[in-house]
Amino acid sequence: MKLSRKESVRRRHQRVRRKINGTAERPRLSVFRSNNHIYAQIIDDVAQHTLAAASTLEATLRGELESTATQEASAAVGKLVAQRALDKGIEQVVFDRGGNLYHGRVKALAEAARSAGLNF
């Protein structure tokens, strides 16, 4: 039986998470993508603590964006999460694509975070 798209994403995410882990020195930039929104968190897995977060649900972004499900919206979230991380002194991160392919909205978020100053 063929796997559903959701199950494929879940399995890929498990494979990715086995290989990467965020620390206090190099936390994990985790991306979750839904049909309408995108969420990014910077997580210290050792302390199990979220250090910075951003999403298209935030009021500051919603006013600026025409749609929350576009690459432009993802890029805005990437810039915002990078800005918040840099304000807290975080420059190095490990990228966790969350089981999604590195393409489209996930790629736009990653490239915007890189251009805003995060290294990964």
From Swiss-Prot:
Gene Ontology MF terms: 5S rRNA binding; structural constituent of ribosome
Keyword Cytoplasm found: no
Gene3D superfamilies (alphabetical): 3.30.420.100
Signal peptide: none
Stored Pfam families: Ribosomal_L18p
Subunit: Part of the 50S ribosomal subunit; part of the 5S rRNA/L5/L18/L25 subcomplex. Contacts the 5S and 23S rRNAs.
Protein's name according to its UniProt entry: Large ribosomal subunit protein uL18
Organism, as annotated: Microcystis aeruginosa (strain NIES-843 / IAM M-2473)
